[in-house]
């Protein structure tokens, strides 16, 4: 349909709301949040602090949309609220200054979550490991300093477990749950990777939580024991060492992709037992999303695969190639919305019409 080639340098994905497309990218020494219309035309471009020139330069996070506002955190910890219609800044907080944010070599990479009146994030600093800010003003609502660890690279998930809304996430060496209303640490368990790269959003279902890390750490299913303030290991597989590609739970089956172990298999396993249902090395190392009964898998060098769900796991239905790039270039996950597929790669954003009928020969 179209290609927009002024996204800036970075790995941010896209968020789509109210007929607009939002992303972020680095231009020179500054990071910007951008808004496009559905035809791929730039509507506005608003700065949010300094660009990231450290390891793997470029933007990391995708703006979060909520009730006419965008919430975006840059790699240095500047968290800003913007008017989604105009890009005008409403408030901004320096997480390093307020909470002494501490993070790893690849900077902060968390997509913040909005829950009710709160913006939730994990600065990982001694003045605030996990925090909640008022989404209207940026004022601090609560601070958790019980967690004794620094920020990792994953985005959290918010679920209801044992009657309480809780944020589940990973730090550098822990998987944990925090009460959304109070900030109290509800439970935690060690999850110590071989390489400090915890980037997978935890997958939750009925008291079970799957987390993983790449570079031979592997994937682990935990069962929360909230009364004891911990979570217990149900199973562990070293070959399910997801890195940044995400994992999906569909009808009791867990889908994802290994990093180093198992030859970068795209996998389908039983969620509760870890038993293999199907493995496939042909897709490469992929980032995934699901829509309309299909899985969309973009590998890190530019091959896009459409994967059908089947009784015995999955089947690759079709593939096409974007411009081939080196490993770990196509890191933004595919996004499907309104019958379109959006793919971001560095400066480029592609939009494909999923409803278009093939041209007759």
Predicted regions: what is each one?
Residues 1-361:
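Noncatalytic, solvent-exposed loop/strand surfaces
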């Amino acid at each position: 349909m179209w290609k927009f080639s002024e996204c800036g340098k970075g790995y941010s994905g896209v968020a789509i709301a109210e007929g607009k497309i939002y992303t972020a990218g680095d231009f020179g020494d500054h990071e910007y949040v951008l808004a496009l219309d559905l035809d791929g035309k730039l509507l506005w471009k608003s700065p949010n602090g300094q660009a990231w020139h450290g390891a793997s330069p470029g933007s990391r996070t995708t703006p979060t949309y909520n009730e006419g506002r965008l919430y975006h955190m840059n790699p240095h910890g500047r968290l800003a609220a913007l008017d989604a219609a105009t890009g005008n800044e409403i408030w901004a907080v320096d997480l390093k200054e307020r909470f002494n944010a501490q993070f790893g070599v690849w900077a902060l990479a968390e997509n913040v979550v909005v829950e009710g009146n709160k913006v939730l994030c994990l600065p990982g600093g001694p003045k605030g490991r996990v925090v909640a800010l008022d989404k209207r003003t940026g004022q601090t609502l609560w601070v958790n300093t019980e967690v004794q660890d620094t920020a990792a690279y994953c985005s959290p998930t918010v679920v209801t477990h044992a009657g309480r809304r809780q944020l589940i996430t990973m730090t550098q060496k822990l998987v944990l749950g925090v009460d959304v209303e109070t900030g109290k640490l509800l439970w935690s368990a060690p999850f110590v990777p071989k390489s400090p790269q915890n980037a997978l959003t935890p997958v939750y279902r009925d008291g079970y939580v799957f987390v993983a890390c790449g570079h031979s750490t592997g994937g682990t299913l935990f069962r929360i024991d909230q009364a004891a303030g911990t979570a217990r290991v149900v199973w562990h597989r070293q070959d399910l060492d997801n890195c940044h590609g995400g994992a999906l739970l569909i009808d009791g089956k867990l889908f994802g992709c290994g990093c180093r172990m198992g030859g970068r298999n795209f996998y389908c396993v039983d969620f509760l037992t870890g038993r293999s249902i199907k493995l496939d090395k042909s897709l490469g190392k992929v980032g995934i999303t699901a829509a309309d009964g299909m899985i969309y898998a973009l590998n890190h060098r530019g091959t896009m695969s459409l994967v059908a769900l089947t009784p015995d796991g999955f089947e690759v239905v079709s593939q096409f190639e974007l411009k081939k790039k080196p490993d770990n270039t196509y890191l933004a996950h595919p996004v499907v919305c309104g019958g379109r597929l959006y793919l971001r790669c560095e400066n480029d954003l592609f939009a494909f019409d999923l409803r278009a009928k093939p041209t007759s020969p």
